[in-house]
Amino acid sequence: SIRRQRQMCIRDSCNDDGIDILDIEIPEGYALSAGTSTIFLNSSVAYDTPADWITGAYDVRFTRGDRLYDDVRTSNNGHGGGLGPVYAGYSCGSCHRNAGRTKPSLWTEGGSGSYGFSSMLVYISRKNGAFFQDYGRVLHDQAIYGVQPEGKLSVEYTYETFSFPDGEAYTLCKPNYTISEWYAEEIKPEDLFCTVRIPLRHVGMGQMMALDPVEIEALAAKSNYPEYGISGRCNYITERGVRSLGLSGNKAQHADLTVELGFSSDMGVTNSRYPEEICEGQIQVNQGSMMGLSYDQLDVSTEEMENVDLYMQSLGVPARRNVNDPQVIKGEQNFYKAKCHLCHVTTLHTKTRGSVLLNNTQLPWLGGQTIHPYSDYLLHDMGSEIMGVGLNDNYISGLARGNEWRTTPLWGIGLQEKVNGPVSYTHLTLPTNREV
């Protein structure tokens, strides 16, 4: 496969088809972002390349999982099908391009539903936090041919320019979302809480799943710096009947990589954990049936989902680059001076046994590693707004309140534009560059 060729080229110090490969000696310390899972790429596939320990049968499974992650699902019954009848994305890669992020498509499409595609996830609820009976927790603004989407998402952006103390300008864009063309009950704006999020990068997923909960809980115990107005806490959720430490998601609202949930909620693809259509009981199931589709079988197998889980957990993490560059060193000094490290913790450790897949297959290669994700994976109160733009989305996730957000890991962020082009750096599309 092309990925294996890329890895071979790294080892042999060659170059294939102009792919940009860093020809450097393996450094020590912080440059090794993820221990033995660190990779040395500076290209558009820097997030989408396996760690070196993926070989043999695992390489075969990785490739299968990669294909399932990227391939466009169809509405047909059978292998590769099951999309819809309503959905939010047509594949994992449609929102997580190259295992990264996507530019909010509403910038150019003008709206979602029958009018365009949205790569953003729209959470909706009543003002009291309850879900709408006819819609659930997520607005599915896409639908297969002949089926009505749940609603249309539109947006208007307001731009405002500010300046740093040295005079350098930066821009914040404030989104104003509206939902129209509801398929059932029309929800009035005054009755609706709506939070729209851009997909997260899938960098370091395996390392995150291998983290030692004791270390994270210890960080929460000491993460209280009243002199800086900083404190952090864990999110705990109940999944599969077990109370667990939340690690993944904008609000650390999940204890795993949500592969099964992603297939179901995002794509409408039924599976062993979520065997019912996401719009079960809604008119869209009948509309799909009238198009000749059957909804009496699972759309994706557990084995296929396990391969996607393996793919995500075994992706390599890009090394820190240019660590001896004077400007980089100065930036690192400013990082500590500004106390960024109090939340974006530089160094963590993985459990000795590593992580496990959905079928409890052990991944020992992820165990006993010193990693540098630049995150504490804790919830922090981000306040109600920044420069007049609301940060409190009033959406409760586990123990996380509306103004609390998980510290985003920073590893690989310097390659984001190379991987995904000009995209936002927060869940709300606020800043248009990293400096903010």
Language-model regions, residue ranges each:
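Extracellular low-complexity, Gly/Ser/Thr-rich intrinsically disordered linkers
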Residues: 277-317, 327-333, 406-428, 434
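Single conserved hydrophobic/aromatic residue that forms the stacking wall/gate
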Residues: 1-6, 10-12, 427-436
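Active-site substrate-binding loop specific to GH73 endo-beta-N-acetylglucosaminidase modules
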Residues: 231-291
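Bacterial Sec-dependent N-terminal signal peptides
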Residues: 4-7, 11-34
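Short glycine/threonine-rich turn/loop motifs
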Residues: 25-56, 60-238, 317-425
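Extended, non-globular alpha-helical segments
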Residues: 18-19, 29-30, 109-111, 292-300
